[in-house]
């Protein structure tokens, strides 16, 4: 909690839930980010025992001035350097005398000479040796501020009173954020989730040119690094506070993770959410060709294009809460996403036929092969999810253009562009089925499901019949057009009517273009009512995708019936794996072969709601499949 912008109060509560007294060492730690080891020109900051105050750490840095960490009681203060233990890691004799692993070595290995006896360094900890009785809680208080040590810094009454006041203020704030319909338990879960995403902000510093050529004060990297990964991203200069998937296990941004983060962030900090979405589109992130950086390990990889969706959701959330939307933000994002959309069309459509690839697309090991690597037999994958993401992207851009056209008619032309893109993609996914089209049908009529298709060098095409989210993502490409918007956009409406009349080969592959639905809405979707029912029959089957906790990433039928494919004498296999991954793909700690992934479930809920907005209460499906219980799509979504 903060007393003021320069005064941070820290209370650490240690609870013993067991039946016996427990002893432990608690080490609140303060350190400087290492900025001095790389270019040789940066002054080293300093931590030391505050003179005359053995329970306070003096913090000195040339740019930011002096601070102090006040520690309750009489802990043992330990100091070392925030530098790598080169001897242990690289087996060299040179390196710092005191290294960042010193506290572990001191406590666990008994190496008392691992810490600096002069009590100075760039990393420090206050060691508390605690004994906590069963069922009791011990509290340790610290305070970080710009005030010299003295009496009263940790006075318990004032300290605890201020934290209690900040807690009340936080309670009042979240009462304005969370729906009143939530139970107390659900509200706590929501607050914990929002706290988690706020806590995962991190300063992220990655300069590709520095990484390729090395730091001035360090040994030069091998020459092949300059021809390796990320060598085409020399413009990338990241030095910003960024929302991370997790500051410990995943301390780097991923393009689509960040977009998803921004939607809940918009509830508590809409300005930060907007800044994050704009940041990834700036010139020092986005490639000059329009590609968004995927993540640091391989900036060239491709995440699903959900940036437009997230920007519109953030815009709508702020508009609902404040009564007015930030149109300047929406326009900034839209203008830059035009570049990204064009990159997708030019780079990820191998045959120029509106059937897209994209590689792993964030779904890691969901495929038969590593979809980011060359295929074992050559050729390419026509991806159901890649194509569907682009259909959704087209509709998201159409929705943004429609919103902006309310005040600027110039956006009507751009709305028409994205509407026509969507028509072409929907046409391609169905193989132009109404007019005898061939060659690109990702829909399997027999199974009532969408699959990736392996397109071999000899022209043969093999559907990869894995029941996975790859076949459900076509559901996400859905948008309704309100009659009021169509009336206002006269030019767009004329163009739409012309297409319906003169290009039935295209409009016939889009759900319900000719027929107004509930409240005269128009529907743009890949799935017509028949295909919608067939896909939902699979998705809502408890033996397949529907679990007690959401929609699985892969159908449970693959538990007993793995998918197998033989290519050049090698068998490839996909099995339902609801827990840990059995493959080493993408580090081995990422599993898309069974677990429920919340962001995709969120998008599926949103898609069902949109279908319901068009079809209304007259359209029902069996949920769960085989139960005899009929529900509207709105009921299924909830």
Q: How should each PLM-predicted stretch be described?
A:
Residues 1-638:
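Acidic, mature catalytic/reactive cores of soluble proteins
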């Amino acid at each position: 909690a903060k007393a003021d912008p320069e005064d941070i109060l820290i209370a650490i509560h240690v609870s013993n839930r067991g039946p016996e007294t427990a002893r432990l060492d608690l080490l609140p730690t303060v350190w400087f980010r290492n900025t001095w080891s790389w270019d040789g020109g940066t002054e080293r900051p300093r931590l030391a025992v505050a003179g005359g105050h053995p329970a306070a750490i003096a913090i000195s840095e040339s740019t930011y001035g002096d601070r102090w960490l006040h520690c309750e009681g009489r802990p043992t203060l330990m100091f070392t350097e925030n530098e790598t233990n080169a001897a242990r890691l690289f087996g060299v004799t040179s390196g710092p005398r005191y290294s960042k692993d010193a506290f572990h070595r001191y406590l666990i290995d008994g190496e008392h000479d691992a810490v600096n006896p002069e009590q100075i360094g760039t990393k420090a900890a206050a060691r508390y040796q605690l004994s906590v009785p069963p069922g009791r809680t011990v509290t340790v208080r610290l305070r970080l501020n710009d005030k010299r040590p003295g009496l009263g810094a940790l006075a318990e009454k004032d300290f605890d009173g201020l934290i209690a006041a900040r807690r009340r203020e936080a309670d009042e704030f979240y009462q304005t954020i969370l729906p009143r319909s939530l139970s107390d338990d659900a509200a706590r879960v929501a607050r914990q989730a929002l706290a988690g995403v706020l806590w995962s902000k991190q300063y992220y510093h990655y300069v590709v040119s520095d990484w390729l050529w090395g730091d001035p004060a360090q040994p030069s990297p091998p020459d092949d690094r300059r021809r390796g990964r990320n060598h085409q991203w020399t413009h990338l200069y990241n030095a910003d506070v960024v929302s991370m998937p997790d500051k410990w296990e995943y301390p780097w941004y991923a393009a689509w993770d960040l977009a998803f983060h921004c939607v809940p962030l918009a509830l508590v900090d809409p300005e930060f959410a907007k800044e994050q979405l704009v940041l990834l589109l700036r010139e020092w992130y986005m490639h000059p060709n329009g590609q968004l950086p995927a993540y640091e390990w391989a900036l060239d990889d491709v995440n699903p294009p959900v940036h437009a969706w997230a920007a519109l959701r953030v815009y709508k959330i702020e508009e609902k809460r404040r009564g007015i939307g930030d149109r300047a933000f929406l326009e900034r994002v839209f203008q830059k996403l035009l570049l990204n959309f064009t990159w997708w069309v030019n780079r990820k459509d191998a045959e120029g036929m509106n059937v897209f690839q994209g590689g792993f697309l964030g779904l890691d090991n969901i495929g038969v092969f590593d979809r980011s690597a060359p295929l074992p037999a050559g050729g390419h994958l026509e991806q159901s999810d890649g194509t569907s993401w682009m259909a959704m992207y087209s509709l998201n851009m159409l929705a943004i253009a429609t919103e902006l056209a309310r005040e600027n008619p110039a956006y009507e032309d751009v709305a028409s562009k994205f509407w026509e893109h969507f028509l072409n993609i929907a046409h391609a996914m169905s193989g132009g089925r109404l007019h005898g089209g061939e060659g690109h049908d990702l829909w399997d009529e027999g199974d009532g499901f969408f699959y990736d298709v392996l397109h071999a060098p000899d022209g043969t095409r093999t559907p990869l019949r894995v029941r996975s989210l790859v076949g459900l993502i076509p559901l996400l490409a859905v948008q309704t057009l309100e009659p009021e918007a169509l009336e206002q956009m006269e030019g767009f409406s004329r163009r739409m009517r012309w297409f319906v009349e003169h290009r039935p080969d295209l409009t016939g592959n889009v759900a319900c273009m000719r027929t107004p639905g509930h409240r005269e809405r128009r529907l743009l979707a890949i799935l017509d009512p028949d295909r919608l029912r067939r896909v939902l029959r699979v998705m809502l089957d408890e033996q397949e995708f529907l679990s007690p906790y959401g929609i699985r990433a892969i159908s449970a039928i693959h538990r007993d019936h793995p998918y197998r494919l033989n290519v050049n004498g090698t068998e490839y296999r996909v099995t339902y794996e609801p827990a840990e991954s059995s493959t080493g793909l993408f580090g081995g700690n990422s599993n898309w072969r069974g677990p429920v992934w919340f962001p995709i479930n969120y998008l599926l809920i949103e898609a069902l709601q949109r279908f319901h907005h068009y079809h209304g209460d007259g359209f029902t499906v069996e949920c769960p499949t085989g139960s005899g219980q009929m529900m509207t799509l709105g009921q299924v979504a909830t």
